[in-house]
């Protein structure tokens, strides 16, 4: 069956990349605007017992990722049938409506249900990745996907700061309405600025899920990349629950603990913002597989000394360097995925990858909390380093066996 995508030359992929970057930036801001005060909003909805507050805060945070993991393959299949632009529009508008409803919620059960619906309707960033990956020339895909990844990262960095200021100035509920407005701007911008020439595929002509993997050049490698994506998120998420407490252990009872913890939490994102396009471009030249394995090993070498630091400054420096390495990982994975998948199934492959990413977002904090409860904060970094090391070794073995990269570039 002929691919549903038109030749690359008929589309201004540079313009689409810029607009998709802006969309990912706005989506990153929108999602992170409400994150700093989620527990406060749960409390506002009537959950006041400290134990219950912790439980509900964890539930409303994780349920979005759980439902996103479930829904992503469905939306990916629909994207391969109907096009990626319509999925961007569906995601932006759907999330905008849900954010309005969240601001109107009157009970914790309503809020929990809406967080689940948010996960079901989300997916702007993976669909943007699929759109750009299928339009950009293959020899520029590492740079393009690396640059695109900085949109969501930079939005997520700015969002909590703006969200905190807005919540202090206007209250908690208005921030949800402001977030909805940001997502609606993303919808309008995508509607009028993104161009995609896509020939819809009849449902009867669509490949079934098991057939998708038969079209891949190296199915085993793709499965390894899915697991790598999950472990990247596990490694990131495992540290999140204990970071503030670890900083307090290192610094003592300082007055500006929240500021110092927030700074240390955000520096990896700043480093990733700087490194992702550069390492993506380097990957286009020397191969994304080398970048992936090298940066996984660098991550291991940085995680281990984090368990030995004596003050917050040392931790901050190591986390900045870790962010620079991590900034190359997901773009390298995405580049390898598009090398191995045809445009015909790209939407589903990226959606499966998103499902594994969501699973990592859920399991990472659980692993970090469990390890710290049994062996202390420092053990979290050691255990995480071991998990990443296993993934680096397995990825290296799998990537060594894959076909020559030049044959992957031949379409």
Curated annotation (Swiss-Prot):
Query: Which Pfam families does the entry link to?
Result: MFS_1, Sugar_tr
UniProtKB keywords: Cell inner membrane, Cell membrane, Membrane, Transmembrane, Transmembrane helix, Transport
* UniProt superkingdom: Bacteria
Q: Does the keyword Signal apply?
A: no
Q: Which GO terms describe its molecular function?
A: transmembrane transporter activity
GO cellular component annotations of the record: plasma membrane
The UniProt entry lists membrane topology as: Multi-pass membrane protein
The cross-references to PROSITE patterns, in alphabetical order and at most eight, read: MFS (PS50850)
Q: Which residues cross the membrane?
A: 17-37, 59-79, 92-112, 116-136, 147-167, 174-194, 222-242, 257-277, 291-311, 320-340, 379-399
| Chief location | membrane
Provide the protein's localization. Cell inner membrane
Per the record, the similarity remark reads:
Belongs to the major facilitator superfamily. DHA1 family. MdtG (TC 2.A.1.2.20) subfamily.
Write down what this protein is called.
Multidrug resistance protein MdtG
């Amino acid at each position: 069956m002929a691919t549903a995508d038109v030749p690359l030359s008929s589309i201004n992929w540079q313009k689409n990349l810029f607009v998709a970057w802006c969309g990912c930036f706005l989506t990153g801001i929108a999602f992170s605007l409400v994150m700093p005060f989620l527990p406060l909003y749960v409390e506002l909805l009537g959950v006041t017992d400290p134990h219950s507050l912790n439980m509900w805060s964890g539930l409303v945070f994780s349920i979005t990722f759980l439902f996103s993991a479930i829904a992503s393959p469905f939306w990916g299949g629909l994207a391969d049938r109907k096009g990626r632009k319509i999925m961007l529009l569906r995601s932006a508008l759907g999330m905008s409506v849900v954010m309005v409803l969240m601001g109107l919620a009157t009970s914790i059960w309503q809020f929990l249900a809406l967080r689940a619906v948010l996960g079901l309707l989300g997916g702007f960033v993976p669909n943007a990745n699929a759109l750009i990956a299928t339009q950009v020339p293959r020899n520029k895909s590492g740079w393009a996907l690396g640059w695109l990844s900085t949109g969501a990262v930079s939005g997520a960095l700015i969002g909590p700061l703006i969200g905190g200021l807005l919540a202090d100035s206007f209250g908690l509920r208005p921030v949800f309405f402001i977030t909805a407005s940001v997502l609606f701007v993303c919808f309008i911008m995508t509607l009028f600025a993104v161009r995609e020439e896509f020939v819809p595929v009849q449902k009867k002509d669509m490949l079934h899920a098991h057939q998708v993997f038969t079209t891949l050049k190296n199915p085993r490698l793709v499965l390894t990349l899915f697991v790598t994506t999950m472990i990247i998120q596990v490694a990131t998420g495992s540290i999140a629950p204990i970071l503030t407490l670890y900083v307090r252990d290192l610094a003592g009872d300082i007055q500006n603990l929240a500021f110092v913890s927030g700074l240390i939490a955000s520096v990896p994102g700043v480093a990733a913002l700087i490194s992702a396009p550069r390492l993506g471009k380097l990957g286009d030249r020397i191969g994304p597989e080398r970048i992936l394995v090298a940066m996984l090993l660098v991550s291991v070498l940085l995680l281990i000394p984090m368990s030995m630091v004596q003050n917050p400054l040392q931790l901050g420096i190591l986390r900045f360097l870790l962010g620079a390495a991590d900034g190359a990982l997901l773009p390298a994975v995405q580049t390898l995925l598009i090398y191995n998948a045809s445009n015909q199934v790209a939407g589903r492959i990226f959606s499966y990858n998103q499902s594994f990413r969501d699973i990592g977002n859920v399991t990472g904090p659980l692993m970090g909390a469990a390890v710290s409860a049994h062996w202390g904060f420092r053990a979290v970094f050691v255990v995480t380093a071991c998990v990443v090391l296993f993934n680096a070794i397995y990825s290296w073995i799998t990537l060594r066996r894959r076909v020559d990269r030049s044959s992957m570039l031949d379409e």
